[in-house]
Curated annotation (Swiss-Prot):
Family assignment from sequence similarity: Belongs to the IL-17 family.
Classification via Pfam families: IL17
Reported induction: Up-regulated in the colon, but not in spleen or liver, during infection with Citrobacter rodentium. Up-regulated by various inflammatory cytokines, including TNF, IL1B, IL17A and IL17F in colon epithelial cells.
Signal peptide: 1-16
InterPro entries membership: Cystine-knot_cytokine, IL-17_chr, IL-17_fam
Quaternary structure, from the entry: Binds to a heterodimer formed by IL17RA and IL17RE.
Protein name: Interleukin-17C
Tissues where this protein is expressed: Expressed by epithelial cells after bacterial challenge. Low expression, if any, in lymphocytes.
UniProt source species: Mus musculus
Keywords associated with the record: Cytokine, Disulfide bond, Inflammatory response, Secreted, Signal
Gene that produces this protein: Il17c
Mutant phenotype after disruption: Mutant animals develop normally and do not exhibit any pronounced immunological deficiency.
SS bond partners: C125-C185, C130-C187
Sequence intervals crossing the membrane: none
Length: 194
């Protein structure tokens, strides 16, 4: 799967050293872009134009609709006091999957200015257990867990244009990274009976 993804990325985005298998790794220096080369600290257009087809990934595709409906919780941890809802079939027949699930979840927008795409929709499970389909109430007989999707992102980091250890103000280097993004929740058997 990784090979297929990397096949259509620009050469500058696919920098990977060959596996070392006991040999020392040679680390190539990433290009350091000056403030003049970047528009307001954004990634260079040539890295974004042939991007990793981000708009097709669920965490990216959901952002616009979440922003339109006002679901804006940025870079925070799980909600304090989140309660597992009571499932009432008559109330959720027309609802979205995440609201009808016996392991319901909500989405929030995570924003990271040093990541491209900067905004991602991430799922948060609403229950520790799962909802019993007969009673509509949470049961601890099952556990809600996040479903994770791997997503290739572009990271920016401060860099030095003059070769010193101190970063040059407004200058950045960019590298790719796979992250795991929660896209939903599902029910599983508990790992133990404790």
């Amino acid at each position: 799967m990784s090979l297929l993804l990397l096949g259509w990325l620009p050469t500058g985005m696919t920098h990977q050293d060959p596996p070392s298998w006991g040999k020392p790794r040679s680390h190539r220096t990433l290009r350091c872009y000056s403030a003049e080369e970047l528009s307001h600290g954004q990634a260079p257009p040539h890295l974004l134009t042939r991007s990793a087809r981000w708009e097709q990934a669920l965490p990216v595709a959901l952002v616009a609709s979440l922003e339109a409906t006002g679901h804006r919780r940025q870079h925070e941890g799980p909600l304090a006091g989140t309660q597992c809802p009571v499932l009432r079939p008559e109330e959720v027949l027309e609802a979205d999957t995440h609201e009808r699930s016996i392991s319901p979840w909500r989405y929030r927008i995570d924003t990271d200015e040093n990541r491209y795409p900067q905004k991602l929709a991430v799922a948060e499970c609403l229950c520790r257990g799962c909802i019993n389909a007969k009673t509509g109430r949470e049961t601890a007989a099952l556990n809600s867990v996040q479903l994770l999707q791997s997503l290739l992102v572009l990271r920016r980091q401060p860099c030095s244009r003059d070769g010193t250890a101190d970063p040059t103000p407004g200058s950045f280097a960019f590298h790719t990274e796979f992250i795991r993004v929660p896209v939903g929740c599902t029910c599983v058997l508990p790992r133990s009976t404790q």
